[in-house]
Amino acid sequence: LNIIENNEVFYAMKSFTFFMHNIYAMGGTVKSVTQLANTLAEKGHPVTIISVFRGADSPYFELHSAIKVKVLVDYRLKLKNTRAITANRIKKYTPFLNTKVISQFEPGKSQFSSYVEKKMIKAIRHTKTDVLVGTRASFNILISKYAKAEIVTIAMEHMNFDAHPDQYQKEIIAAYRNINKITTLTVADQQKYQSQL
């Protein structure tokens, strides 16, 4: 974005927010998000990572010092985390804390409760950023519903489209019509999305 003011050009660096499962865990998605976030931060972009879960003191991979990390649910054994830990335990024994909005096809659905879901939706609704990047199909679906209209939304896919059940594929396609951009793992997946969107 170029801003012309008094015959000078100022470059307003776009802010990026990544909405992801757990920046504190090991995994391919974590590694790719870390690399991209670090590159953006090195170029001067304000970068925030919203990590739904936290179970360790430090992110698994080293993050640029300018990157902000916001945690929604902290599972470390500390007194201040009692509510989150208790909600997660109780969910296993009662249907009252089942999710209402997260897709039933989310592969890790057992990790989510209505308590976690509410925190996720609130975070998406209140995120102030130029670009919001979802890193999981179910997260992208939530972003398509709850992100502010002025935010550029990106669905970063880390699974092949055909790996999803047929019903989930339909749910994804319907939601992604409200997403601005999609990144895919393969050219074949790119073509599948382009043919349906």
Please state what every model-predicted region is.
Residues 141-143, 180-197:
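A short, active-site helix/loop in glycosyltransferases that binds the activated sugar's phosphate group
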Residues 130-131, 152:
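Structural motif
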Residues 113-116, 134-139:
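Short His-centered aromatic/hydrophobic patch
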Residues 20-26, 39, 43-106, 194:
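N-terminal strand-loop element at the rim of the active site
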Residues 13-17:
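Extreme N-terminal starter segment of soluble prokaryotic enzymes
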Residues 21, 74, 136-137, 157-160:
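Histidine-centered beta-alpha loop that forms part of the nucleotide-sugar donor binding/catalytic region
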